[in-house]
């Protein structure tokens, strides 16, 4: 009986200590990076929201729910079921587009210089990492098969000189959209990473 238990223990250790592939390692780095960006986006949005009056919060949230983020023009899964059905390459390509769409707008986020100086290099590092993952998963497929000619206007009117109320709305929308998009990318990369483990349950 003791020998059987010992044998099961050895087998268990053998199974759980399978070497991590290079692809899994790169995915883990990418997921960790976007997770940190998502946490930063959540913190910045919460700090800004807490600086508002209750009525200002209510009005801005109401406006935001009726508006669109710039990145909404990027074709992406509409729900968790479509996300789970999407290929790894598609999830990576959408993630790349989303990160790329924030490289310029992130410089205009109304946050402290310390936080703003963190965001740009983090986005750049993540974009580079996703590009490496796309190359590793491409197998001759087109990098951006859907809407490859799509060009996004970089939040055009957000850089104009605005009144106090419009400036408040601009800041709210930028921070809310940044948080929303980092959540999307974290979800897509997490699902894509999970696909590398056939025995894993990748449900959202």
UniProtKB/Swiss-Prot annotation:
Keywords: Disulfide bond, Hormone, Metal-binding, Pyrrolidone carboxylic acid, Secreted, Signal, Zinc. The modification Pyrrolidone carboxylic acid is found at residue 18. Belongs to the somatotropin/prolactin family. This is Somatotropin. Growth hormone plays an important role in growth control and is involved in the regulation of several anabolic processes. Implicated as an osmoregulatory substance important for seawater adaptation. The keyword Metal-binding applies. It holds the Pfam family Hormone_1. PROSITE patterns: SOMATOTROPIN_1, SOMATOTROPIN_2. It comes from Dicentrarchus labrax (European seabass). Transmembrane segments: none annotated. The gene is gh. The keyword RNA-binding does not apply. GO terms for cellular component: extracellular space.
């Amino acid at each position: 009986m003791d020998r059987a238990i010992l044998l099961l223990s050895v087998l268990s250790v053998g199974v759980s200590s399978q070497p991590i592939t290079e692809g899994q390692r790169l995915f883990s780095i990418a997921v960790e990076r976007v997770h940190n960006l998502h946490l930063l986006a959540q913190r910045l949005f919460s700090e800004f929201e807490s600086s508002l009056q209750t009525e200002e919060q209510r009005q801005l949230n109401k406006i935001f729910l009726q508006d669109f983020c710039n990145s909404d023009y990027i074709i992406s899964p509409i729900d968790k079921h479509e996300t789970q059905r999407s290929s790894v390459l598609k999830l990576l390509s959408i993630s790349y587009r989303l990160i790329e769409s924030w490289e310029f707008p992130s410089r205009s986020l109304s946050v402290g210089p310390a936080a703003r100086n963190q965001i740009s290099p983090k986005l750049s590092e993540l974009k580079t990492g996703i590009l490496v993952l796309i190359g590793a998963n491409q197998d001759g497929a087109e990098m951006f098969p859907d809407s490859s000619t799509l060009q996004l206007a970089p939040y055009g009117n957000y850089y104009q000189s605005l009144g106090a109320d419009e400036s408040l709305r601009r800041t709210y929308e930028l921070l809310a959209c940044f948080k929303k998009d980092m959540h999307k990318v974290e979800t897509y990369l997490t699902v894509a990473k999970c696909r590398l483990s056939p025995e894993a349950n990748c449900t959202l």
